[in-house]
């Protein structure tokens, strides 16, 4: 067992790093609490190590209080502390967003001989607590509400209506942006639940919400923020003895409005030459923006995820790359330079740096 040998108080620190000749170490840094450093580092080498890490990998030191919080046009976008939920605020109006519930996932496990009880009560209880804490006017389910892709499993006729019937008693205003698992979802939902098109919805002319399995609708190209699910991002930590810990994560990355516009135009079968942003403005009346893109973790924490700190050869099969969706595959979102955060606001670093550290 590795024992802590150094206590170091600070606002924030680099959290995960590996030198070529040394094992990986994990540092945690809640505000105004000590940081315990595990391993064989000497006290005198700590600051030098941090400096080398920062210079070698261009890693940034994050302000814990503001980690993951974005503000523009009177709109605030911030993860709910310690939860896989995103809170949007605009002039006193609050909207809560969650993604990837995958209700009925237990049925797939049962077909494989693994029997677990229904997760609907547990997910409802978790969501009820978040709703009580955040008090939103609207709840948006950002795709993959159910698990079966193109059909409705027999058990889903029980699980999904049961979930929604209980949900609308907690919060009456609920909207769904369908994902690739949400075929034939509408018959399972109450009439009061609004089901949007799968290419997304826009809030306050600033926030575009889409699941991520398909190109967003043209109006989303003008948003300052894009929010998507679908990927189920996780990070995998491994200690020197080979034990692995998997943690869900947020990813925040910049989108290239021009590339995104070109992809949407091709999806719309629109012929154009030259500047795609100009064509989008002419065809749809939308001024294309380079948005901040937030990739959400799955709300159902029993699901697996894509290890963003593994390279494609080790952690991502060709099938998983297909599951990334057209936006990420196209390079319209700079995923490699995206910033990864844990649920407590811990800044892990850029995705490409985390992959290099994991090699």
Each model region followed by its residue ranges:
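Short hydrophobic transmembrane-like helices used for membrane targeting/insertion
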Residues: 1, 20, 35-37
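Compositionally biased, low-complexity intrinsically disordered regions
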Residues: 15, 30-32
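Basic polycationic patches enriched in arginine
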Residues: 18, 40-42, 52
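Cationic, low-complexity basic patches in intrinsically disordered or flexible, solvent-exposed regions
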Residues: 4, 8, 33
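Extended recognition/assembly regions associated with phosphoester-bond processing machinery
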Residues: 44-359
């Amino acid at each position: 067992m590795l024992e802590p040998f150094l206590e170091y108080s600070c606002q924030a620190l680099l959290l995960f790093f590996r030198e070529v000749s040394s094992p990986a170490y994990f540092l945690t840094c809640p505000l105004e609490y000590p940081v315990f450093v595990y391993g064989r580092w000497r006290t005198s080498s700590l600051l030098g190590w941090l400096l080398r890490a920062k210079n070698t990998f261009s890693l940034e030191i994050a302000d814990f209080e503001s980690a993951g919080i974005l503000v523009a046009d009177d709109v605030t976008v911030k993860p709910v502390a310690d939860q896989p939920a995103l809170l949007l605020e605009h002039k006193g109006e609050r909207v809560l967003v969650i993604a990837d519930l995958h209700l009925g996932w237990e049925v797939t496990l049962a077909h494989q001989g693994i029997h677990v009880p229904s997760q609907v009560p547990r997910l409802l209880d978790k969501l009820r607590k978040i709703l009580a804490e955040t008090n939103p006017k609207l709840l948006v389910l950002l795709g993959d509400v159910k698990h079966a892709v193109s059909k409705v499993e027999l058990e889903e006729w029980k699980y999904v209506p049961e979930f929604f019937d209980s949900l609308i008693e907690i919060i009456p205003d609920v909207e769904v942006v369908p994902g690739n698992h949400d075929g034939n979802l509408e018959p399972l939902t109450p009439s009061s639940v609004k089901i949007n098109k799968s290419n997304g919805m826009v809030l306050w002319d600033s926030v575009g919400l889409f699941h991520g399995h398909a190109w967003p609708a043209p109006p989303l190209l003008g948003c300052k923020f894009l929010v998507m699910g679908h990927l189920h991002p996780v990070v995998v930590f491994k200690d020197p003895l080979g034990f692995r810990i998997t943690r869900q994560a947020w990813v925040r990355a910049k989108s290239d409005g021009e590339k995104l516009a070109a992809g949407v135009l091709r999806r719309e079968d629109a012929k154009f030459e030259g500047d795609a942003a100009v064509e989008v403005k002419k065809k749809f009346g939308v001024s294309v923006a380079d948005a901040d893109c937030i990739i959400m973790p799955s709300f159902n924490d029993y699901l697996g995820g894509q290890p963003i700190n593994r390279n494609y050869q080790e952690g991502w099969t060709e099938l998983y790359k297909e599951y990334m969706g057209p936006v990420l595959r196209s390079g319209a979102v700079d995923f490699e330079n995206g910033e990864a955060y844990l649920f407590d606001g811990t800044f892990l670093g850029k995705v490409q740096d985390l992959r290099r550290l994991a090699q």
